[in-house]
Regions:
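Sec-dependent N-terminal signal peptides
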Residues: 2-12
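Extracellular/lumen-exposed scaffold segments
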Residues: 15-177
Length: 177
């Protein structure tokens, strides 16, 4: 019986399951939580959960803002979300992100798009080893404060991939320069 429970516990944290979460804390409150996994479809999926009142920004936020500014100087710029994949994974396709919310304040020449509550990001990947790291840089904000995010997630690729992530078809490719 003990062996059965140990095997089941091991399956619960397998490569098909989510990585250990990276929690971003501001004033004793977890404002953002990131997790990652690789699915059977060969996608690296990164899930973001935000606390009420917090939001973060699109991967292509700067490109979108520059388009709206049309050469004018911005009075403020929110930091885009970015991921750096290293170790036993290589990105083999465009990054995808969900539909965006518009946080822009055109009267102040501030243009920004992003996410509230939850967001998933995905990219097709190739396995090249048994462990990988996903570096995360972003910014999470409320109406009054912002927190720079610089964290990482570790993935054990020696374990089986999980089922294809539902909802990937709703994601769209990020804009490129």
């Amino acid at each position: 019986m003990k062996l059965f429970l140990l095997v089941m516990a091991g399956l619960a944290v397998s490569g098909g399951e989510w990585s250990k979460p990276a929690e971003i804390v501001v004033d004793d409150t977890v404002c953002a939580t990131y997790r990652a996994r690789v699915d059977d479809g060969g996608h690296l999926v990164i899930a973001l959960t935000l606390a009420d009142g917090w939001h973060t920004f699109a991967m292509d936020n700067q490109i979108r803002a520059n388009e709206k500014l049309a050469g004018k100087k911005a009075l403020g710029m929110d930091k885009p979300t970015s991921f750096v994949v290293s170790g036993g994974l290589t990105v083999d396709g465009p990054w995808m992100q969900p539909a965006l919310l518009d946080f822009s304040k055109p009267e102040l020449r501030i243009f920004s798009w992003g996410f509230e509550k939850q967001a998933s990001f995905a990219a097709k990947v190739k396995r090249t080893g048994t462990a990988a790291r996903v570096g995360i840089r972003a910014q999470a904000c409320t109406e009054t404060i912002c927190k720079d995010i610089n964290t990482s997630l570790d993935l054990d690729l020696a374990l089986a991939a999980g089922p294809v992530e539902p909802g990937l078809s709703a994601l769209t490719p990020i804009r490129a320069q």
